[in-house]
Amino acid sequence: MDKSESTSAGRNRRRRPRRGSRSAPSSSDANFRVLSQQLSRLNKTLAAGRPTINHPTFVGSERCKPGYTFTSITLKPPKIDRGSYYGKRLLLPDSVMEYDKKLVSRIQIRVNPLPKFDSTVWVTVRKVPASSDLSVAAISAMFADGASPVLVYQYAASGVQANNKLLYDLSAMRADIGDMRKYAVLVYSKDDALETDELVLHVDVEHQRIPTSGVLPV
């Protein structure tokens, strides 16, 4: 072997990568990948341009249908004796009721237990006759007929039950905002008396988009 061949062979040997010279992926690399995935999902959500029925006090979320938004109202049941009932009709703000022909697709109820909550309640939403006085007897019959879904929410040691929302689909009924006067949220306190400061119900009514004012109130 002449000198030039020896020099070329030496260079080739030097070009070979050393075993183990590449470092293993660090934890910071893994964290960066996770962050990138989260940002990608966030960008897709923002790009969709649709409101999301979401709230930190309940598990999971539902994205509004295209062309729809939602209006939320809050209900705080009064004290309910053990084995007794409570009912409250859905009263949306006047600014929403003005568009009474806009369709309603879904009603979602989110049960938010306050720190003192230690009871078991059943919650549902029902269409009730205008003549109904939402008496104990009337509400009891509506819970018993099985005509609408019921959420059973009970005390958990952690203070938060895994499932604390009820979704009621009205799409097939062609209900509109004006019909919401005919619906009521019903509560049954099963095993214990429910105190006034134990529970809050967030009711989200998903409906077709309505015009919004471009002028700030005076």
Curated annotation (Swiss-Prot):
Key word RNA-binding present: yes
GO molecular function: RNA binding; structural molecule activity
Keyword Ribonucleoprotein (UniProt): yes
Record-linked InterPro entries: Cucumovirus_coat, Cucumovirus_coat_Asu_sf
Endpoints of the signal sequence: none
Subcellular location: Virion
GO CC annotations on file: ribonucleoprotein complex; T=3 icosahedral viral capsid; viral nucleocapsid
Entry keyword set: Acetylation, Capsid protein, Ribonucleoprotein, RNA-binding, T=3 icosahedral capsid protein, Viral nucleoprotein, Virion
Region span, Disordered: 1-30
Biased composition (Basic residues): 11-21
Residue(s) carrying N-acetylmethionine: M1
Job description of the protein: Capsid protein. Probably binds RNA and plays a role in packaging.
Domain notes: The N-terminal arginine-rich stretch does not seem to be the major RNA-binding region that allows formation of an infectious ribonucleoprotein complex.
Protein family membership: Belongs to the cucumovirus capsid protein family.
The protein's name: Capsid protein
Source organism of the structure: Cucumber mosaic virus (strain Iizuka)
